[in-house]
Amino acid sequence: MLRFLRRTFGRRSMQRYARGAAGRGAAGLGDERDGGPRGGPAAAASSSVLPAAPGGSVFPAGGGPLLTGGAAVHISASGAAKATLYCRVFLLDGTEVSVDLPKHAKGQDLFDQIVYHLDLVETDYFGLQFLDSAQVTHWLDHSKPIKKQMKVGPAYALHFRVKYYSSEPNNLREEFTRYLFVLQLRHDILSGKLKCPYETAVELAALCLQAELGECELPEHTPELVSEFRFIPNQTEAMEFDIFQRWKEYRGKSPAQAELSYLNKAKWLEMYGVDMHVVRGRDGCEYSLGLTPTGILIFEGANKIGLFFWPKITKMDFKKSKLTLVVVEDDDQGREQEHTFVFRLDSARTCKHLWKCAVEHHAFFRLRTPSNSKSARSDFIRLGSRFRFSGRTEYQATHGSRLRRTSTFERKPSKRYPSRRHSTFKASNPVIAAQLCSKTNPEVHNYQPQFHPNVHPSQPRWRPHSPNVSNHSTCKQNKPSFQDDRPHWKASASGDDGHFDYVHDQNQRNLGGAYSVTYRDKLMTAL
C-alpha cells in the first residue's frame, strides 16, 4: 500500500507529471486525466456546495428542516456602536438567530453570543460554518474579524454545527451537548453525507422514536406512525416496519439514555466524524483526504486506500495549491524512513483551508494543551502561515469542564409528513391525484402509490372502507407489509382525513412563527 501511495503522491512522481503535462500543453496535446474528475469522494467533501434553502438556510438534500418549532430570535448589539454587522445564524434545531455586532467584531464575539443564547457549556466541539463566493464551506476563525473572512454579505449567513465529532460520546458530560450531537448526526444521515448500513439505520431510527415519543404503545402506535418521520434519504415501507419492531425493544429508555445509545451506535460508522476534502494525485485523478481523530484517510472513489496516523506525520506544509506531507514508516528491517507525499488542490485558498483543518484536527485530538508560543514553530505546522490553533483540546474539554448541577432545555419535535397509508389512498384516487399535480408544491409526499385499483374518474370521492384494501397491492416485497398481520388496526370514524388533520395540527402547534398552509380536500399541500 505504501508503495502505491509513493508512486501516486510522491514528490518525484509529481515533478515528472508536471513536466509531462507542460510538454503536452506546449505541443497542443491534451490529456484526459487533466480534465474532469474520475470518481467521487466517499462522502460529501468539505469543498462541496451545500444545498441552500430559501432564506439562506442549509437543510439536508431533498428534505427540508429536520425539526419544527424553530423560531426567529434577534439579539441586539450591546453598547452605543452605530455601525453594526448583521449576522444570521441557523441552529441545528431550525431556529434562526439574528445578531447585531459592532463593525469590527471578531468571530469569537459572534460565537460567544450564540453559545450564550443556547446556554451551552461544552462549546469546544462546535463551530460556525459559512459559504464563500465560490460556494466552498469554511469554519469561522474566532481570532479574525468577521468582515475579513466573509465576503458574501451583509447579511452574513452562518450555520452552527458540530466541528469535532467526539471519538468517545461517553465523555460528553452535558445531556444538551449529546442532544446537539444527535441532531447533527441525524442531519448527516438524512442528507446522505454519512452512509449508514440498513441494520444500523433501523436501530438509530428506533432510538430517535424512543427519545421523542417515549414508549411504543401498540394500540396507539403503529408502523403507519413511523412513516410520518424521515430518517434516511430512501426510506421504504419495509424499513419502517423493521423500525417499528425495533422500537418496541427499547422500552424503558429515557430520552437521555436513548440519545446516548444513539451516539454509541453511530460512533462505529465507518465515516463517523470524517471531514472530507477533494485533492488530486500525480495522475490528475480525484482522491479524497478524510481528517479523523486518529489520522488522515485516503480514498479513491469509495475505496479506502491508505491511512496516515497523526504520530507518523512529522511535517505538513503547503505552498500555493500544493500540500506536502512527510510521513515516517518502518521498512522491512524495522528502520524508520521518511516518505514525502504531495497533493494538489484547485486553488491556493482551498489548499490553505485543508491545511488549517488538518492542523486543528491534529491539535484538538492529539495534544493535551495547544502551543501558546508565538515565536517557536513546531515541525508539524511550519511554513507559509501564522495560523495557530487557539482553542482547547479534547483532553482539556473532557477533564477541565465544570459540571452544572441542573440544566433544562427543550427538545424540538421532528417535522411530520403525511403517513404512508394516507398518501397511498390519496394518490390512488385519479381525481385527487390530478388536483395534487396542479399545486405549486410539487412534492406533497415522498411516497409512490403501492397499488393502482381500477377506479373510474367519475367517482370523485372514492375512499376505501377498510385498510385491508392494501392486500390488492401489486408491489411484491421480501418483507410482509405491516397491514397483513395487524388485525387490531381500525380506521378512524372520521376517515383518513382525520389522521391527516392530526399531523397538520401537530406541525401547526410546533411552528414558532408565521406560516402559510393551503388545503385541497382537507389535504395539506404545503408543509
UniProtKB/Swiss-Prot annotation:
Main location class: cytoplasm
Region listing for Disordered, in residue ranges: 23-47, 400-425, 455-493
Domain of life: Eukaryota
InterPro entries: Band_41_domain, EHM2_FERM_F1, Ez/rad/moesin-like, FA, FERM/acyl-CoA-bd_prot_sf, FERM_2, FERM_central, FERM_CS
Keywords of the record: Cell junction, Cytoplasm, Phosphoprotein, Tight junction
Biased composition (Basic residues): 413-424
GO process annotations (BP): actomyosin structure organization; positive regulation of cell adhesion; positive regulation of gene expression; positive regulation of keratinocyte migration; wound healing
Subcellular location: Cytoplasm; Cell junction, Tight junction
Subunit-level organization: Interacts (via FERM domain) with ARHGEF18 (via C-terminus); the interaction activates ARHGEF18.
Protein name: Band 4.1-like protein 4B
Organism of origin: Rattus norvegicus
Phylogenetic classification of the source organism: Eukaryota, Metazoa, Chordata, Craniata, Vertebrata
